[in-house]
Amino acid sequence: MNYLQLPKIDLHCHLDGSVRPQTVIDLAKLQDVTIPSFNVDDIKALMVAPASCPNLDEYLTRFALPVSVMQTEAALERISFELFEDAAKENVKYLEVRFGPQLHQKMSLNFEQIIGSVVKGMRRAEAQYDIKGNYILSIIKVLPKDDINDVIDAGAKFLNNGVVAFDLAASEEPGFCHEYIPYAKYALEKGYRITIHAGEQGVGQNVYDAISLLGAERIGHGIHINSHQQAYELVKTEAVALETCPSSNVQTKAVESIESHPFGDFYRDGLLVTINTDNRTVSDTTMTKELQLAAEKFNLTEADYFAIYKMSVDNAFTSDEVKLSLLKFID
């Protein structure tokens, strides 16, 4: 397979984990933000997580630096544009980007300005490249809950016009879904689709809860359903798609090694699985790298890849018109 030339879909990609290191330097200079160095190699070293982190929390420390310069409308628009540009250049045809609007208020932007800026950057890239996209709004679980509905309300103005879904992100504690039932219900009432980070860090019950309590149609990661029979069966019977991110899962110790990643077993058992980057910069990856890794480690043929691509299309939070256009790339 020519991994670079194959059409690709990425349904799980974080904006703040996919910023170009040079852009952090450029924006720090423009905004007069203090950063540790203006050397691009130094900045990249601070943004890329080690190949093996002790845990997810250590991995998440890599986001503070890019977030520090993502506090203006111009910065958010630029970073959004550049992410879609980078993806388009490796034949990603559809990209769903998630980000937490709550993290971008240090310069007093309101949520509508924040969301509008990233959508504007995406639209600029769509006009320039052969790529389509949408945004997912991630609620950061370690932050106060008092403005969650404000995020949902602001995003609702862009629903099906750049914004499509609601997500819960950040470190994963057992039973977290119970605290977010009213917010997921509110998002559903507004018309959001639901995808939830769950089952990344060894808690299969969280996947069961995300589907049964929060209405999740897709699960971010979800790999630890392999140790929770009820969650596994629910994912299978309800046809819930798993957004797997192989490189990231190895880095965060969600799995010990790529060889022990359950992706291949899930695929061969008929689960809906997709291949995604998670964080292009923090994990120092691309969709091309992820596809090659998955193909080589899980013995995927080109026919397997096209089946997985089709699963990604079927489970994308986009219009039937866009889905039909994406399927034409594998006709």
Curated annotation (Swiss-Prot):
> So where does Zn(2+) get bound?
H12, H14, H197, D278
EC numbers for this chain? 3.5.4.4
Q: Which GO terms describe its cellular component?
A: cytosol
Q: Name one GO biological process term.
A: inosine biosynthetic process
Cofactor remark from the record: Binds 1 zinc ion per subunit.
Q: Where is this site: Important for catalytic activity?
A: H221
Tell me where on the tree of life, at the top rank, the source sits.
Bacteria
Q: Which UniProt keywords are given for this protein, alphabetically ordered? A: Hydrolase, Metal-binding, Nucleotide metabolism, Zinc
User: Does the keyword Metal-binding belong to this entry?
Assistant: yes
**Which cofactors?**
Zn(2+)
Cite the InterPro entries for this sequence: A_deaminase (IPR028893), A_deaminase_dom (IPR001365), Ado/ade_deaminase (IPR006330), Metal_Hydrolase (IPR032466)
Query: Key word Zinc present in the record?
Result: yes
Query: What is the catalytic activity of this protein?
Result: adenosine + H2O + H(+) = inosine + NH4(+); 2'-deoxyadenosine + H2O + H(+) = 2'-deoxyinosine + NH4(+)
Q: Where does substrate bind?
A: H14, D16
Q: Which residues form a coiled coil?
A: none
Query: Main role?
Result: Catalyzes the hydrolytic deamination of adenosine and 2-deoxyadenosine.
Q: Which family does it belong to?
A: Belongs to the metallo-dependent hydrolases superfamily. Adenosine and AMP deaminases family. Adenosine deaminase subfamily.
Q: What is this protein called?
A: Adenosine deaminase
Gene behind this protein: add
